[in-house]
Every structure is written in C-alpha cells, then in structure tokens.
Amino acid sequence: NWLGTLLDTDQNGLKKQMKKTLKAAQKLQGKPFVITAKMDGSSCTFFIKDGTFGVCSRTMNLKPSDKNSFWRMAYEYEAEKKIKEYFPNKNIAVQGELYGPGINKNRVGVTTLKFCAFNLFDIDSQRYLSHSELDLFCTMKQIPRVPLVEIGDSFNYSLEKLQEIANYLKYETNNIAEGIVIRPLQ
C-alpha cells in the first residue's frame, strides 16, 4: 500500500529518495493525486481505540501529561471530543505533524506550537480514508490540515518538475518548506 513519497529539498536527501520516488511516481502516472507541503516537525497521532483516547509520537504511545507537547495539542484542539463526535463507536487515528518552538529547530518559523493533520486511518479495516474524508473531517471539526499544493485528475509530473516544485515551496511564514508529499487521491 503506497502511502506517499517525500521529495526533500536538499540534494543529498533527494538522492536518497530518488529510487523510491521514481517507482512511486510511475505507479501514480495517469491517476488522480494530491500534493501537500511536508511540514518540518514531529509526527503526532491522536486516536480512539475501543473507546479509549490516546496520543502517539512516531514510535511511542505517550502518557497523558500537561507538560507533554503532543498532549497539549490534543487538549488544545479537543481531539478526543472531535474524533468521538465525528466517528462515534469507531476506532480511528488522526495522523499529523506537530511543529513550532522546541520541535525540530522550528524550521517552519511559527511563534506557537501547532498541529496539522495529513491522514485519517480506520484502525479496524486497516485502511486510510480518502482525501475528501480527511478534508471534510478537518473542516467540520476545525482541525488544521497540511498545506495543499495541488489536486489533480491525472498525475503526469516528471521527477525534475516535482523537484522544482519542492525547491521553491514556502510555508506561510515565508521559510522554505521541507518538501512535498504526493499521494493518490483515492
């Protein structure tokens, strides 16, 4: 299951991703797609599993704590309440990026801690929900999404064009973005 490919803006990172990106781009040729900005922060997931709310970093299920940045974002965005309201009696994960002061050198350049979603995952069926389902959930529940670069009906970009897009993309703070993520529209 291909989930997305990052095109890094630095040349060394791009070379490391080249083979993976090329294969993924070939699979996506002619298919509907979405391109978003890669936020430079830390992976953060809010989830409901069997009625219990939890917060994870990329590799750890975190204990609830007001001192933990991940949990502070969950509280600030009322993630538990919003997920349970929108997906009653379902096991769902909202995957996103935590960024801001104290996170990965704050390369985005914001003044406060922030979260933006990039995936919805149905835990029971083990499948990612569509871009439109993510968009509707985030709109209805006022949860920020990763910045959208482009949505299209037929992916036909060359690797060089994708690199150009990634190299010139900026965050709203005018800092150069970490890169782009390309996904099937589903």
Predicted regions and their residues:
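Core nucleotide-handling region used for phosphoryl-transfer chemistry
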Residues: N1-Q186
